[in-house]
């Protein structure tokens, strides 16, 4: 199946065990909803329902997140898939916190110029489309690691709902029709497998409300259900991925898959107005950027400004500009960048310096080419 490059938010799952158990089934809009015992939030109501059922059956937050993630592999083909990667931040009822990094990794055969032609120009959008654009997937390994360390229910039980969703099918939606129309327009051979999977008879879009089944995905998920991480990184699935790559000019090998490892990392921890903030560390920029922004915002009386007032939005924009400038300048993969000044970036003293550079009567520039030199 053709895969496209997955960016920062491959999938987002929120499992909150603080707030009767319910699932909001509306697909559109943002509607605040309370719950007293538990809440599962995802991009698709069927995935959220699957995760909520895990909680009702006595599973914990990590169990629910795993089930929700695999269900999204079925219901959210544009992002929530097993062919990408992601991050997980965990904070337990006992106060312990940890994070898991399972982002995609470059194959061993990757090189600096693999996307460029003889003139140094990107070839055929190959950095965004096609087999060269993807890294070695990490989702299955990451969820497997999180389950081994923090899960409570049997792995097979947690993956089962996604297998059933793929086998039995679920109603297509207008959103899905819009997303999958992309494949209908593609004529290159590399898209043949995707068209078979995502289009009716390989040619037509499923109409909203029509049942969509994914037997090949169900088979892949079944191997993961029964064999754990080896059901993806070794054996039949790995062989199928390697064969596809070879056929279409990709470079991911069975060895790349077998060698993939997720990692558990110490979280970014800070404090905002008395609240502990726990975030994802690099290679994610999220934890550092959020903490940097909050530290700057702490210097302002936001309540007095009023929500979405001109003054409030100005401060918020300026704070974000500074955090994203530092994000571009400093944050990378710690496996290749050992000297990131993380403690400085999330310190209160540094936030004081940045906040002092904000002028209330003047907007600063948003120039990515000059990031890192604009403010201090």
Q: Could you say what each language-model-derived stretch is?
A:
Residues 10-22:
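Bacterial N-terminal signal peptides
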Residues 136, 286, 290, 312-313:
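Short, charged, low-complexity patches
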Residues 1-12:
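Bacterial N-terminal signal peptides that target proteins for export
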Residues 299-376:
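Internal maturation/activation junctions in enzymes
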């Amino acid at each position: 199946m053709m895969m496209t490059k997955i960016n920062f938010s491959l999938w987002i799952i929120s499992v909150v065990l603080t707030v009767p158990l319910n699932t909001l089934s509306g697909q559109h809009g943002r509607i605040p909803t309370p719950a007293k015992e538990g809440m599962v939030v995802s991009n698709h109501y069927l995935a959220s329902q699957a995760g909520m059922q895990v909680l009702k059956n006595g599973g914990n937050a990590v169990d629910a997140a795993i089930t929700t993630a695999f269900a999204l592999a079925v219901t959210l083909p544009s992002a929530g898939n097993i062919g990408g990667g992601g991050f997980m931040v965990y904070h337990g009822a006992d106060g312990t916190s940890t994070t898991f990094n399972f982002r995609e990794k470059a194959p061993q055969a990757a090189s600096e110029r693999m996307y460029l032609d003889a003139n140094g120009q990107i070839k055929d959008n190959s950095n965004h489309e096609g087999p060269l654009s993807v890294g070695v997937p990490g989702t299955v390994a990451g969820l497997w690691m999180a389950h081994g360390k923090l899960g409570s229910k049997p792995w097979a039980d947690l993956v089962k709902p996604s297998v059933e969703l793929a086998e039995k099918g679920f109603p297509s939606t207008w959103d899905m029709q819009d997303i999958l129309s992309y494949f209908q327009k593609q004529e290159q051979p590399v898209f043949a497998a995707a068209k078979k999977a995502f289009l009716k008879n390989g040619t037509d879009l499923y109409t909203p409300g029509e049942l969509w089944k994914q037997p090949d995905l169900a088979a892949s998920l079944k191997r993961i259900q029964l064999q754990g991480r080896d059901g993806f990184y070794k054996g039949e699935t790995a062989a199928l991925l390697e064969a596809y790559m070879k056929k279409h000019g990709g470079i991911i090998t069975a060895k790349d898959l077998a060698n993939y490892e997720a990692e558990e990392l110490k979280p970014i921890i800070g404090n905002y107005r008395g609240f502990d903030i726990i975030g994802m560390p690099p290679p994610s920029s999220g934890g550092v950027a959020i903490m940097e922004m909050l530290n700057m915002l702490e210097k302002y009386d936001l309540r007095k400004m009023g929500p979405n007032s001109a003054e409030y939005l100005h401060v918020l924009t300026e704070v974000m500009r500074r955090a994203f400038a530092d994000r571009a300048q400093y944050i990378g993969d710690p496996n290749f960048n050992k000297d990131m000044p993380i403690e400085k970036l999330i310190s209160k003293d540094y936030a004081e310096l940045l906040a002092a550079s904000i002028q209330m009567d003047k907007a600063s520039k948003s120039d990515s080419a000059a990031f890192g030199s604009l403010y201090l």
